[in-house]
Design a protein with these regions (language model features):
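Glycine-rich ThDP/TPP pyrophosphate-binding loop and its adjacent helix/strand module
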Residues: 2-66
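Active-site cofactor/cluster-binding pocket
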Residues: 3, 40, 55, 130-167, ...
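Beta-strand segments within the central parallel beta-sheet cores of soluble alpha/beta enzyme folds
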Residues: 7, 105-108, 194-199
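Gly-rich Lys/Arg/Thr-decorated short loops/hinges at beta-loop-alpha junctions or inter-strand turns
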Residues: 12-20, 66-72, 101, 161-163, ...
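Generic, well-ordered alpha-helical scaffold segments in large soluble proteins
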Residues: 35-38, 42, 87-96, 128, ...
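Active-site lining segments that contact anionic ligands and/or coordinate catalytic metals
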Residues: 43-45, 71, 88-90, 104-106, ...
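Iron-sulfur cluster-binding cysteine motifs and their immediate structural context
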Residues: 52-53, 58-64, 82-139
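Short, flexible loop segments at boundaries between secondary-structure elements
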Residues: 70-86
Length: 322
């Protein structure tokens, strides 16, 4: 091998490792593009190793206090932000989200999903504000809850036919967790259940489905995946996923659909500064597929953040509505 290079976000840790050959170069990830251009001009075999812990894995370890958690957070001052999108281009991060203001579409950082990589601040922008704190302040109170208890819902019987539920959303938001929660709850009640998760190659932000079937006994469930036209309830954690052809094709004519109006940005938002989620078109598409009164939409992410301080509880809000 003519040349070996390690690129990492923590070069000091690689330097401290024993067993690294003396001819192996170690560089910060900021030099990745220059290193790639350098290696392509070398005749022969070269090796480029990129060392960085997955963002989702960092979040898991931080929850278990097994990975350093920087005591700082980044915010974007929307009064200064001009919506140029350079922060998105620098970071390729979907936690940099659009926010509508009186002066047009600006940028904001979703504090519930931010992995504290901080590459967004490398953009040429004075609107970033660094706050040195470990935890966000939780809401002290929430005014607006209705008084009294709602009417007790009528729970359909599972004696003659199973209940088929599809949860659709994006990776990293708890779609699989919600499917597992429903399956375990049914199991604890002594009911038969089948749960199948469809994540495919989805990473954080990719499309994810969880198919949940509940029945009084196992013989009522003939297939693990919900067949086309057989879904009774669709919990749409993301409106873009819920309004897709793949989701709509599973619905029964009498299906009930609960959809979160707060859509997550897609890859197109990074590439196009003027991208916006076509929520109105998606809701119209759902209305055309679902009978009147069977579609419920709500800003679940905003409710979860305002009431509980974190949008990670969005799916539980939708489950409660269902």
């Amino acid at each position: 091998i003519k040349k070996q290079v390690i690129v990492t976000d923590e070069p000091e840790l690689i330097h401290a490792e024993e067993g690294i050959a003396p001819d192996v170069e170690i560089h910060h990830r900021n030099e990745l593009d220059a290193i790639q251009r350098q290696l392509r001009d070398i005749s022969g075999v070269t090796a480029l190793i990129y060392v960085q812990t997955c963002a989702s894995e960092k979040r898991r370890r931080r929850k278990r206090n097994a990975y350093p958690d920087p005591a700082e957070r980044l915010f974007i001052n929307t009064d200064i932000c001009e919506g140029c999108g350079d922060c998105s281009k620098q970071s390729n991060c979907l936690s940099v989200e659009p926010v509508e203001t009186e002066l047009g579409t600006k940028r904001q950082i979703n504090q519930s999903t931010c992995n504290k990589d901080f590459t967004c601040v490398e953009g040429f922008c004075p609107s970033f504000v660094t706050v040195h704190t470990r935890d966000m302040k939780r809401p002290e109170k929430f005014v607006g809850f209705p008084t009294g208890w709602p009417e007790k819902p009528i729970i359909p019987s599972l004696e003659n036919t199973p209940s088929r539920i599809m949860v659709g959303g994006v990776g990293g938001t708890g779609v699989v967790t919600l499917g597992a929660l429903l399956g375990m709850a049914a199991h604890l009640e002594g009911k038969a259940t089948r749960v199948m998760d469809m994540a495919g190659l989805a990473q954080k932000g990719g499309t994810v489905y969880s198919y949940v079937q509940l029945a009084s006994d196992d013989e009522q469930i003939s297939a693990t995946k919900i067949p086309a036209g057989q879904c009774d309830i669709l919990i749409g954690a993301d409106a873009i996923v819920a309004g897709s052809k793949a989701a709509l094709s599973r619905l029964r004519d009498e299906a009930v659909v609960i959809v979160n109006e707060d859509a997550s940005p897609t890859l197109s938002f990074i590439e196009s500064r003027d991208w916006y989620a076509p929520i109105t078109d998606l809701i119209t598409r759902l209305k055309g597929r679902v009978h009147h009164g069977k579609l419920v939409t709500l800003p679940a992410a905003r409710i979860a953040t305002q009431v509980l301080g974190d949008s990670i509880y969005t799916n539980q809000i939708l489950l409660g509505m269902a």
